[in-house]
Amino acid sequence: MSEETKSLNFIEHIIEEDLANGLSKDKLRFRFPPEPNGYLHIGHTKAIGISFGLGEKYNAPVNLRFDDTNPAKEEQEYVDAIKKDVAWLGYQWENELYSSDYFQQLYDWAVQLIKDGKAYVDSQSSEAMAEQKGTPTQPGVDGPYRNRSVEENLDLFERMKNGEFEEGAHILRAKIDMQHPNMLMRDPIMYRVLKKHHHRTGNDWCIYPMYDWTHGESDYIEQVSHSLCSLEFKPHRELYNWFKEHIYNYASDTLPMLPKQREFARLNLSYTIMSKRKLLKLVEEGIVSGWDDPRMPTISGLRRRGYTPNSIRKFIEKVGVAKRENVIDVSLLEFCIREDLNKTANRVMAVLDPIKVVITNYPEDKEEWLEAENNQEDDSAGYRKVPFSREIYIERDDFKEEAGNKYFRLKLGGEVRLKNAYIIKANDVVKDQNGAILEVHCTYDEDTSKKVKGTLHWVSIKHAIIAEIREYDRLFSHESPDSDKDKDFMEFINPKSLTIKTGYLEPSLATVEVGEQFQFQRLGYFNVDDDSTAEKLVFNKTVGLRDSWAKQKPKPQNNQNQNKAKPQQQKRSAISVIQQFGKKYTNLSEEKQLKVKSEIQELAKDVSYDDLEPLFGTAVKKAGTRIAVLIALKELLKNGLERNDAINEFIEKAKADKNEVLVAEASEI
């Protein structure tokens, strides 16, 4: 088996088999068939990615077909939103089609089924029909109208179409088998009376086809080769085949190819609700501001939050195509946007919780415009000028009056480097009557070649522009908010999912445009929100620089014997835990590697250069340990550690290694 064949997912294997068995490649055709009754969400991106991805792989057309058979719930607004979302993701459809395009053909085929004794009009109440249908372990029984004459069925069905009956008076059912082990095959409904205005056909129709009748026949009309849907539709496949095989008898001359339905596991995401009904409840009860609220899992919400098409497509690629349901950790999605924005977002400085720093030996009337690199990951990003003056803001938690040796930020008597500027030393503080610090008085040193361990971001007070900063977090505090049988999902709403702050930003951001993305250095990735105006800028936090939830996940309880032994064990140092992670890193799955990477990034906060440096000489064959060291080193460099010859040599050796993961980590530094 070739490497290429090994890497195929199970759907691609099916397609390759069909091609090998004589299906012409130019007959391949796929479709994405959303119902226009709501906004697309992250769960839909898997279905979109699979169908359009196959279209790209095989150079085959993909139809965007709207399954618009329920006028009670469907609107043009949703059609427009779906088209916008699919196009934004970077996919191009061959044809824009609608199930309503086929209403007349579906009706004509239904009439033919009645004539062949394969469909009948039932006039019972829904309760009576449900009772006759039986259970999964008990067969159904025939209803009193099952053996109506063909003539009576044709007459009633035409009168249903002409609007002579009220909703619920009659339905059309396929005549299959009321004792069938698959309950979906027990005379399923094909048509119901629904006197609602349709967003495309107006009032032309007052009977509407059901999903199972419409879905397969639309595939057949369009000559779709492979009809791909999620696993919950697997029991429907038998009915899908029954309908298409009977219709084939009526149209095989003009429509020679029968489509094939296959199912894949849908996308389930931790800390996320996918149900349209529940998402609607969040909107209606004002928990979120609308369908495009940046906390919503809708594509419009993700777009507004700052997610990119590339990050979402990369996420779908990493999730892959599976046959079994599983839950994907949302941290994988967050990892993908971090990786994407790390390469593309310009770095800027912003302070969100300011404390004033006065540089007492810097002239009051002096200001300088210093050169700052926009993005060290992108040579073409260039440089910008940032103003420096006597009074600046730094983050409040970047200063402590007293701190230990492992605190590398500003403290009394300690020195730090100001990003793109000078080294300062804290000498004194000014406090209010309650003891709260108002100002930190520092002196600066023009000699920037000195080695100091900490680097802080800052903003010149007199040049700062003010903006509203919306810091978003996960909307739910529970990993699986709709799985608790005893609690409503609304009880797991995270009260801290939105925090609004006033930010002080460097003046280069004064002319930004809606949608632009930046890394606020040391804080995270932010984008310009739609609510921004010329008078007031609004930024959304897309994602932090690291996974802040990794350390919050509950750990399983140890058994009693383990608990007894625990007091005798010394707590392992952060560096030893990082080494331990490194030993198993290369044996982990990609998803587990991402989780471990987040934990190493968190542990790096408690690691110094002196801890890491001895590990630079780790044996070549211990790739996992070297990867772990690189991950930690990258965090230290982000927080101001200066590169030296030992660091550069370690990175260059890693770049030349045969291990692809090691090379990738080294290349990111």
Write out the residue ranges for each language-model feature.
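Core subunits and conserved enzymes of cellular information-processing
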Residues: 233, 237, 241-243, 310-313, ...
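Active-site cores that bind ATP or allylic diphosphates and position pyrophosphate for catalysis
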Residues: 68-70, 76, 98, 112-279, ...
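Residue-level signature of the C-terminal ends
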Residues: 602-607, 622, 635-643, 650-653, ...
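Amphipathic alpha-helical elements of HEAT/ARM-like alpha-solenoid repeat scaffolds that form extended
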Residues: 592-604, 626-637, 661-669
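Short coil turns that connect the paired helices of HEAT/ARM alpha-solenoid repeats
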Residues: 586-591, 618-624, 653-661
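N-terminal catalytic cores of NTP/NDP-binding nucleotidyl/phosphoryl-transfer enzymes
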Residues: 6-83, 199-230
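A glycine-rich helix N-cap at a beta->alpha junction
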Residues: 78-104, 109-112, 117-120
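Amphipathic alpha-helical scaffolding segments comprising HEAT/armadillo-like alpha-solenoid repeats
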Residues: 574-582, 606-617, 641-652
